[in-house]
C-alpha cells in the first residue's frame, strides 16, 4: 500500500471517529469548528492540525447533567432567582440549608421571579411548591337584588403550606373567622370550614419557565351553620399551571368541587386565570400589576336550600335551582415582593355576569405572605 493511500485511510478513520464523538457528546464547539486529524507515521499517532491562525484547538467542556440542573441542591444555589426583583432587599433570611432531606421546607427553587395570585384564594391554588404562611382578609358584598338581599361578609383567615420535597407540598387553604351580615339572614359570626390537601408538581421546567401541578383538597364540615358553613364535606381535585415570558407571567387553575353528600351540596367547576407584568424592575422592583378572571359553573342541583343562587367560593349552599348557571368575575390589583421571603397583594373583583343571579357583588382581597 502506498504511503499516500495509507494516509488517506487513516484520515478517513479519524474523521469517522471525530463524527462519532461529536454525535455522542453533542459538542457544539466541535460542530462549529471541526478539528482535522492527520496520521504521523514516525510517531505512530494521530496529530491535531492547528487552525490557520496558529491558535490552539478550542477546548470543549463536558456536557452538564440535565437532571442536576433541576435538582433541589442546584436550585437552592440559585435562590432567589436571578430574574427576581424585590422592593427592600434581595438578601435572604437564611442560607437555605438542607433540613432532613433535599427539598424539605425549601421546596421548588428557581421560580421566584413569578408573582403569586391574589384573588379567589380558597380555590386558586398556585402551582409552585413552597413553605409559606399567608394571612388573608376578604371583604365581600352581596348584590342588593339577589336572594340574600344585599349585605356583606368579612373573612379573616390564614393559609399554611409546607414543602415536603421539591415537588410535593401539604396545603391548608381554608379556615378562619367570618362575620356575616346578609339582609335575608340574621347577623352571625363563627368559624369557617377547614380544608387540607396536597399538591405535586408534575412538570417544573426552568428552561421553559413552565410549571404544571396537580392536587386534591378535602373540605370538612366543621364550620358554624349560622354563617353558611358546616353543611357538606367537599373534595376538590385541581390542576394549576404557570408560564413565564420574560417579565410577563400567566397562571391558571381548574378545580372540581364534589360534595360527599350530593343532596346537601352542588357539584361545581371553577377556573381562574392570572396575568401580571413587572412594569419597571429598575424603579419599582418587585412590583407587578395584575388582572385576574374567576369563573364558576354550577353542574347540578341539590336538595338542601330552596334557592336559585349558589354559594360562589365562600360556601356550598346545596341550592335547588342553580344547575347550568355561571358566575364570571374580574379582578384588578397588584403584588409587591418586599424580600425573597415577604410580599403583599391586593385585588378588587367585580362580576362580569348578572350579579343578581348569584351572591357575587364585589370583593376586596388583601394578603400578606411569608415564605421560607
Question: Where do the protein language model's features map onto the residues?
Answer:
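N-terminal secretory signal peptides that target proteins for export/translocation
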Residues: 1-11
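Transmembrane beta-barrel domains of Gram-negative outer membranes and organellar outer membranes
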Residues: 32-260, 266-372
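Bacterial N-terminal signal peptides
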Residues: 17-27
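Cleavable N-terminal targeting peptides that direct proteins into the secretory/outer-membrane pathway or into
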Residues: 11-17
Amino acid at each position: 500500500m502506498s504511503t499516500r493511500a495509507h494516509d488517506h485511510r487513516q484520515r478517513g478513520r479519524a474523521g469517522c471517529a471525530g463524527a462519532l464523538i461529536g454525535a455522542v457528546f453533542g459538542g457544539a464547539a466541535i460542530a462549529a469548528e471541526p478539528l482535522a486529524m492527520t496520521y504521523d507515521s514516525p510517531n505512530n499517532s494521530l496529530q491535531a492540525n492547528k487552525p490557520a491562525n496558529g491558535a490552539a484547538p478550542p477546548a470543549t467542556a463536558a456536557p452538564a447533567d440535565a437532571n442536576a440542573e433541576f435538582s433541589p441542591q442546584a436550585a437552592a444555589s440559585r435562590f432567589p432567582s436571578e430574574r427576581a426583583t424585590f422592593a427592600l432587599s434581595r438578601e435572604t433570611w437564611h442560607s437555605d440549608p438542607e433540613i432532613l432531606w433535599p427539598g424539605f421546607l425549601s421546596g421548588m427553587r428557581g421560580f421566584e421571579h413569578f408573582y403569586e395570585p391574589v384573588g379567589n384564594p380558597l380555590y386558586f391554588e398556585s402551582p409552585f411548591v413552597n413553605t409559606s404562611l399567608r394571612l388573608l382578609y376578604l371583604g365581600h358584598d352581596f348584590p342588593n337584588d339577589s336572594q340574600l338581599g344585599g349585605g356583606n361578609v368579612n373573612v379573616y383567615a390564614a393559609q399554611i403550606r409546607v414543602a415536603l420535597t421539591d415537588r410535593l407540598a401539604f396545603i391548608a387553604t381554608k379556615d378562619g373567622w367570618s362575620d356575616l351580615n346578609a339582609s335575608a339572614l340574621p347577623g352571625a359570626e363563627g368559624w369557617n370550614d377547614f380544608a387540607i390537601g396536597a399538591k405535586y408538581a408534575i412538570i417544573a421546567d426552568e428552561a421553559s419557565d413552565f410549571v404544571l401541578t396537580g392536587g386534591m383538597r378535602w373540605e370538612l364540615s366543621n364550620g358554624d351553620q349560622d354563617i353558611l358553613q358546616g353543611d357538606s364535606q367537599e373534595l376538590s381535585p385541581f390542576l394549576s399551571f404557570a408560564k413565564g415570558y420574560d417579565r410577563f407571567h400567566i397562571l391558571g387553575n381548574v378545580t372540581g368541587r364534589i360534595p360527599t353528600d350530593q343532596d346537601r351540596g352542588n357539584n361545581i367547576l371553577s377556573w381562574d386565570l392570572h396575568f401580571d407584568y413587572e412594569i419597571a424592575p429598575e424603579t419599582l422592583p418587585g412590583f407587578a400589576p395584575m388582572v385576574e378572571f374567576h369563573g364558576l359553573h354550577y353542574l347540578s342541583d341539590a336538595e338542601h336550600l330552596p334557592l336559585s343562587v349558589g354559594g360562589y367560593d365562600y360556601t356550598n349552599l346545596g341550592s335547588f335551582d342553580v344547575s347550568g348557571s355561571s358566575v364570571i368575575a374580574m379582578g384588578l390589583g397588584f403584588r409587591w415582593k418586599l424580600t425573597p421571603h415577604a410580599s403583599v397583594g391586593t385585588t378588587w373583583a367585580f362580576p362580569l355576569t348578572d350579579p343578581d343571579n348569584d351572591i357575587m357583588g364585589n370583593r376586596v382581597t388583601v394578603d400578606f405572605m411569608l415564605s421560607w
